Amino acid sequence: MTKGTSSFGKRRNKTHTLCRRCGRSSYHIQKSKCAQCGYPAAKLRSYHWSVKAKRRKTTGTGRMRHLKIVRRRFRNGFKEGKPTPKKAVASS
């Protein structure tokens, strides 16, 4: 048996299928682990040696439905309640 080019044509079973968390076809069926996001691990798979991959998946690349509101509130000092009434200017 050879282990090179001729044996690659005989491979016909899928090793990976769709991942439920990241949606990529990186979920290894026998290992029961995603090669992309690390599912079923609680934390997302990310490494410092792949800076470009971190840039693709980091905070700010998606909707940020809640965080963009928090960012705006942070700039204004997390003000709450009614706005302060304007002081009447005395005309002289």
Swiss-Prot record:
SUPFAM superfamilies: Zn-binding ribosomal proteins. A zinc finger (C4-type) spans 19-37. PROSITE patterns: RIBOSOMAL_L37E (PS01077). Binds 1 zinc ion per subunit. Its cofactor is Zn(2+). GO terms for molecular function: rRNA binding; structural constituent of ribosome; zinc ion binding. One of its GO terms (cellular component) is cytosolic large ribosomal subunit. Gene3D superfamilies: 2.20.25.30. GO terms for biological process: translation. Keywords: Metal-binding, Ribonucleoprotein, Ribosomal protein, RNA-binding, rRNA-binding, Zinc, Zinc-finger. Zn(2+) binds at residues 19, 22, 34, 37. PANTHER family: 60S RIBOSOMAL PROTEIN L37, RIBOSOMAL PROTEIN L37. Belongs to the eukaryotic ribosomal protein eL37 family. Binds to the 23S rRNA. This is Large ribosomal subunit protein eL37. It comes from Spodoptera frugiperda.
